Regions:
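Generic protein-terminus/edge-of-domain signal
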Residues: 1-57, 64, 96
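Short, Lys/Arg-enriched, Trp-marked, Pro/Gly-tolerant hinge/linker segments that flank
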Residues: 110-119, 136-149, 156-185
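ATP/adenylate-binding site constellation spanning eukaryotic-like Ser/Thr protein kinases
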Residues: 39, 74, 175
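Histidine-centered metal-chelating micro-motifs
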Residues: 59, 63-69, 88-89
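Helix N-cap / beta->alpha transition motif
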Residues: 18, 62, 84-86
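A hydrophobic/aromatic-rich effector-binding and dimerization subdomain
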Residues: 2-10, 70-137, 157-164
């Protein structure tokens, strides 16, 4: 499962990988990177921040990010989507700034056991299934249009999930505030 990940791509790429090529040193990705952890655990660093990944965790960097895997379990596996900056810039035009701000501030999201979050987890796996179907060895005269349509659809779908993610973050903050208040700290 050792897959070499280039720092940029001219087409959308889908991979299932253990990110082994990112263990020895950081790599600067010009393209966008979106991954979902389907098995195992890892700690991923951007040089500024570290993210603990486990099953049902999403991590997205829209473009231009430094990424290194600091440590990973032997069974660590992600489904990864790489998308060219040019396709991203075209696809993101109709999407509002709050989405971009949110993904910049909160690139990592861990799904919870609640029904809504589990439904979203199944849906993101469907998006990854579509990416695999469309972009793994498929040569089509409509490839450019498929990439644009796919990425714009994915980004709009992600934008629609932000409310759910914000509600969860607010619940976590509220729980911490309640815990601190009740314990007298």
């Amino acid at each position: 499962m050792a897959v070499f990940l280039p720092s940029d791509t001219s087409t959308i790429r889908y991979e299932e990988t253990d990110l082994a090529s990112l263990h020895s040193r950081p790599s600067h990705f010009v393209c966008g990177v979106y991954l979902i952890c389907v098995r195992g655990t890892a700690v991923v660093s951007t040089g500024v921040q570290q993210y603990a990944l486990g099953e049902q965790t999403e991590l997205i960097f829209l473009t231009g990010s430094l990424i290194q895997v600091l440590c990973a379990s032997d069974d660590f596996t992600v489904r990864l989507l790489m998308f060219p900056k040019e396709v991203f810039l075209k696809a993101v035009l109709p999407i509002d700034t709050p989405y971009l701000n949110y993904t910049h501030e909160h690139p990592c999201y861990r799904h919870t056991e609640d029904e809504r979050s589990q439904a979203t987890w199944l849906q993101i796996n469907l998006w990854m299934d579509m990416a695999q179907m469309l972009f793994c060895g498929n040569v089509s005269p409509f490839r450019q249009q498929q990439e644009y349509n796919f990425l714009q659809g994915l980004l709009m779908w992600l934008f629609n999930t932000i409310q759910e993610k914000l509600e969860r973050i607010l619940q976590e903050i509220s729980g911490v505030e309640t815990e601190v208040f009740c314990s007298g700290r």
